[in-house]
Amino acid sequence: MKKLFLLSALLIFACSSGGDSDNNEIGNLEYLGTYRGNIDVFLNGTYHSTLNNHQMTFVSIQNSNQVNIIGNLIMTSNCTFDQDGFVIPETIPVTTELFYALEYGSGILNGNSLEIELYQDQINSTTGNVQGTGFWTGTLEKI
């Protein structure tokens, strides 16, 4: 029984943050969390549909402004996020002999609102010409 108690105590101390979890070297991360709203979808420049009540969650990687995106609409799921919003730099998440995908995007934070723009271009590997495009845009509210 003493060993079980000791193990429990060690786990509690090992898992504690040792300080205020809202503050770190880069400042307050309260802007991270879950945002929900409607997203308009455009394929090859033409409106396709609206995703109602879509949810995206931004989770800090090791208490930094580097985050994982849960529920992203493109394959790229990492970005930087600060008090102004997020940026997904140009990324090639998939390549085949015929094409590759180029993704990028951003989100502008204004209070509890996050206005997003996400892009995915399908590019011919031989010619470099764009074969198809996807564009997602909308305003999400922090929940």
Task: Identify the meaning behind each predicted range.
Residues M1-K2:
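N-terminal hydrophobic targeting signals that begin at the initiator methionine
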Residues L7, F13-S16, G111, G128-G132:
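Residue-level recognition of alpha-helix boundary/capping or hinge positions
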Residues G27-N52, L140:
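Tryptophan-anchored aromatic micro-motifs
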Residues R36-L43, E90-P93, E115-N124:
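Generic short beta-strand segments
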Residues S49-Q55, E97-Y104, Q131-G138:
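Amphipathic hydrophobic-ligand
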Residues Q62-E115:
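Contiguous, well-ordered beta-strand patches that form the walls/edges
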